[in-house]
Amino acid sequence: MYSLHLLLRASPAALLLILCLQLGTTKAQEDTTSRQLMTMDLQMLQIDTSEEATVVLEVSTDLRECMVVKAYLLSNIPIEGNFNYKFTSCLCNNYPRRFFWDLQTNSTVRITAVVDVIRELGICPDDWAVIPIKANRFSITKSLP
């Protein structure tokens, strides 16, 4: 009976120790979330089919380091004008970038926005930028009626 009394007396301390260890392990497992290398949102604003359309590409990253990115558009039919412009910018965690293109077409067109992570000096502050090992080209496609 005496040994049973000692077992019940030590139990709350052991339970508290196990609880603390479990909470510590759970917290360590939560810190292993993966960051999004690049998030892209492509919007096409068009009032009427005979008028000019504006293509807006918003690019953001969850990385702590900055990257030099080059953004451009591709299409299934040739389009003239500033559609062919390429934008180079520094993409950092707290500063998403928005790129704008104006285009005019009379038919349905599939537009692909491409963002390349490149190595170029003089774009990011103090030339501090990273290049991902896994992937350096990202794209998103939409149709413009």
UniProtKB/Swiss-Prot annotation:
Sites carrying sugar chains: 106
A Pfam family of this chain: SVA
Subcellular location: Secreted
Key words, A-Z: Disulfide bond, Glycoprotein, Pyrrolidone carboxylic acid, Secreted, Signal
Record-linked Gene3D superfamilies: Immunoglobulins
Gene Ontology annotations for the cellular component aspect, listed alphabetically: extracellular space
Disulfide pairings: 66-92, 90-124
Sites of Pyrrolidone carboxylic acid modification: 29
GO BP, sorted A to Z: proteolysis; regulation of immune system process
Molecular function (Gene Ontology), one example: aspartic-type endopeptidase activity
Homology family: Belongs to the PIP family.
PANTHER family associated with the record: PROLACTIN-INDUCIBLE PROTEIN, PROLACTIN-INDUCIBLE PROTEIN/SEMINAL VESICLE ANTIGEN
Record's protein name: Prolactin-inducible protein homolog
Species the sequence originates in: Bos taurus (Bovine)
